[in-house]
């Protein structure tokens, strides 16, 4: 049988063996002692035709719990959002289908312009001056922000709010360990950073203060109150933010943030089992030469035509490895393109409307749950996620919800022992009133 990906015929094999000077394929392994050779049949299924294989893999895929078959109220950093149809069409074009920013930019003007537009839109959302072409994800972007802060201030202490996503905090701690930085976690009160505890830890040795906006619990951190505390010790103010929320919230840049990072997954990137995603990284203009990753700039050629180039490349490892501001080379250019196309398709008004729908639907879900006797421990304003307290273990409740065709919320107790039996519920613009009402009813039944 001639296989599509193994096109060699028996005649081809005989000809190759003849040229090599052996009689059979077994002769190629003559140097391997008989005592260590495997004898018998390998535990491998027989070959199948493409239609047979397609049916088998489709049957396996049908066993997956995805958002096409289940209604999802799970968020915690990865969200079920609307993706405009045009996104997949554009990113599937052969000119774009790569994770790399090009090394020969003059022959990739279309790709560079798309990345330039991504950078521009991130700056508009965050209120910052400069954004790079992308990072791996939100967690690594935040860790790189910490490293930039430490290098810029020449200080070793990092104040990290416990309301920052637990996985982001783990990545930050991993990076900090290698650089011998001291990470101090700031506790929370009523679901937001404890300002008094933050003041107590502030001193002249602090490189940066890190908060999330909205934070892991969905709460809106009081950036206006945090900023003067963060800058009191000549430290840097770093904010990790959901870019969709910035479509309606005041951008961190207007509160005096020095670095704003986050994950662009809400724009055009599927949930896809948690990755790959696309981190973004934006800074004030004073930090432009210390920002990690690639930067696309706009210029003019000698004939006055607009063009795009990779600029300030001396920061990068392929130019000066020992003095590079980061070692990111390949990045998430394809996902950055997806985010750029999604934001363009939605437009400023569409992004704002989408963000408003998240707030409205999440607020409706919270109010309905409160009506049905659920306790919401954090009273402050939130974006599209909120925490509720259950009477039973979250894992047990989620198992029962799954049987009803619902993917329940995140078990907060996994990361916060003091919040056992608390569920983080995400409600995006895709959830209908009927789906929310059904979820409230089923959660109430599980709760009883």
Curated annotation (Swiss-Prot):
Under the heading Gene3D superfamilies, the entry gives: Aspartate Aminotransferase, domain 1, Type I PLP-dependent aspartate aminotransferase-like (Major domain)
What reaction gets catalysed by this protein? N(6)-[(R)-lipoyl]-L-lysyl-[glycine-cleavage complex H protein] + glycine + H(+) = N(6)-[(R)-S(8)-aminomethyldihydrolipoyl]-L-lysyl-[glycine-cleavage complex H protein] + CO2
* Recorded GO MF terms: glycine dehydrogenase (decarboxylating) activity
What UniProt keywords are attached to this protein's entry? Oxidoreductase
Report the EC code(s) recorded for this entry.
Answer: 1.4.4.2
The alphabetized list of GO BP terms reads: glycine decarboxylation via glycine cleavage system; nucleoside metabolic process
- List the SUPFAM superfamilies hit by this protein, alphabetically: PLP-dependent transferases
Q: What class of enzyme is it?
A: oxidoreductase
Task: Extract the Pfam families matched here.
Answer: GDC-P (PF02347)
Q: Which family does it belong to?
A: Belongs to the GcvP family. N-terminal subunit subfamily.
The protein's role, per its UniProt record: The glycine cleavage system catalyzes the degradation of glycine. The P protein binds the alpha-amino group of glycine through its pyridoxal phosphate cofactor; CO(2) is released and the remaining methylamine moiety is then transferred to the lipoamide cofactor of the H protein.
Quaternary structure and partners: The glycine cleavage system is composed of four proteins: P, T, L and H. In this organism, the P 'protein' is a heterodimer of two subunits.
Q: What is this protein called?
A: Probable glycine dehydrogenase (decarboxylating) subunit 1
Protein encoded by which gene: gcvPA
């Amino acid at each position: 049988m001639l296989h599509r990906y193994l096109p060699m015929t028996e005649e081809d094999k005989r000809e190759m063996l003849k040229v090599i000077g052996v009689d059979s394929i077994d002769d190629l392994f003559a140097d391997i002692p008989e005592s260590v050779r495997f004898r018998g049949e390998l535990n491998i299924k027989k070959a199948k035709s493409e239609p047979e294989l397609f049916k088998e893999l489709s049957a396996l895929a049908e066993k997956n719990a995805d958002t096409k078959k289940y209604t999802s109220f799970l968020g915690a950093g990865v969200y079920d959002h609307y993706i405009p149809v045009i996104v997949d069409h554009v990113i599937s074009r052969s000119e774009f289908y790569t994770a790399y920013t090009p090394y020969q930019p003059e022959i990739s003007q279309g790709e560079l312009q798309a990345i330039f537009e991504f950078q521009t839109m991130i700056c508009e959302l965050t209120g910052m001056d400069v954004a790079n072409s992308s990072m791996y994800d939100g967690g690594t972007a935040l860790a790189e922000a910490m490293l930039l802060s430490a290098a810029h201030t020449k200080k070793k202490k990092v104040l990290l709010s416990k309301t920052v996503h637990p996985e982001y905090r783990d990545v930050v701690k991993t990076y900090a360990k290698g650089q011998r930085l001291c990470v101090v976690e700031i506790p929370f009160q009523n679901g937001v950073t404890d300002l008094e505890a933050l003041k107590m830890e502030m001193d002249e040795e602090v490189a940066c203060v890190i908060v999330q906006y909205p934070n892991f619990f969905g709460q809106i951190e009081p950036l206006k109150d945090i900023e003067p505390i963060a800058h009191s010790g000549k430290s840097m103010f770093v904010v990790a933010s959901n870019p969709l929320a910035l479509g309606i919230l005041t951008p961190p840049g207007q509160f005096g943030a020095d670095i704003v990072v986050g994950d662009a997954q809400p724009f055009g990137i599927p949930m896809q089992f948690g990755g790959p995603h696309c981190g973004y990284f934006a800074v004030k203009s004073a930090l432009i030469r210390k920002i990690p990753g690639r930067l696309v700039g706009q210029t003019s050629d000698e004939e006055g035509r607009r063009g795009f180039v990779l600029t300030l490349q001396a920061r990068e490892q392929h130019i000066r490895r020992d003095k590079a501001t980061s070692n990111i080379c390949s990045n998430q250019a394809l996902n950055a393109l997806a985010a750029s196309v999604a934001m363009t398709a939605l437009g400023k008004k569409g992004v704002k409307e989408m963000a408003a729908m998240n707030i409205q639907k999440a607020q409706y879900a919270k109010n309905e749950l409160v009506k049905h006797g659920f306790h919401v421990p954090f009273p402050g304003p939130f974006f599209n996620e909120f925490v509720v307290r259950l009477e039973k273990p979250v894992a047990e409740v989620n198992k029962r919800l799954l049987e009803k065709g619902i993917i329940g919320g995140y078990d907060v107790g996994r990361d916060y022992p003091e919040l056992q039996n608390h569920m983080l519920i995400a409600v995006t613009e895709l959830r209908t009133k009927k789906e929310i009402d059904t979820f409230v009813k089923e959660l109430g039944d599980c709760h009883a």
